[in-house]
């Protein structure tokens, strides 16, 4: 790995931690954050494996510094998968609303609703029914907002990169 990639990864890790843990709303079972923005943009720019690793590192650092409670590795797996999915479907493409629908659906349904709900039921020893409904409502509301925000940030970042010839 080249030095510039290490530096870029470090910057995005710091940005993801800030957006996921500092500028966020956390309750026991529902988290509303903006960390998905930096993970998606990193995936678009650098691909699935780099985005997955960056997201996992950010999750580990964020949980270590700001986590409430005991460390649980399942969420690191989830964050890796989020980064990987965004990178796999969006890297090297001109991102449009249509192209963003599939990865955002996979992230929302498979990772946030199914996998993370499973981690929460294991971690808190609660029934899925006690956790799922609130998470479902949150994800239904956040789904279109996340797509819109990713598109807005992507357009701004790509415009900046073209201007600066990055």
Give the predicted meaning of each segment.
Residues 1-166:
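Loop-helix junctions at membrane interfaces
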């Amino acid at each position: 790995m080249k030095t510039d990639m290490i530096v870029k990864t470090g910057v995005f890790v710091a940005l993801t931690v800030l957006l996921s843990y500092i500028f966020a709303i956390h309750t026991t079972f529902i988290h509303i954050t903006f960390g998905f923005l930096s993970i998606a943009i990193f995936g678009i720019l650098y691909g699935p494996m780099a985005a997955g690793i960056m997201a996992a590192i950010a999750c580990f650092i964020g949980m270590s510094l700001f986590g409430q409670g005991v460390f649980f590795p399942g969420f690191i797996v989830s964050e890796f998968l989020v980064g990987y999915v965004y990178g796999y479907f969006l890297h090297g493409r001109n991102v449009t609303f249509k192209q963003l629908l599939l990865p955002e659906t996979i992230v929302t349904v498979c990772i946030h609703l199914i996998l993370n709900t499973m981690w929460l039921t294991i971690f808190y020893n609660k029934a899925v029914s006690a956790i799922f409904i609130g998470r479902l409502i949150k994800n239904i509301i956040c789904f279109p907002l996340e797509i819109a925000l990713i598109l807005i940030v992507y357009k701004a970042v790509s415009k900046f990169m073209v201007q600066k010839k990055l």
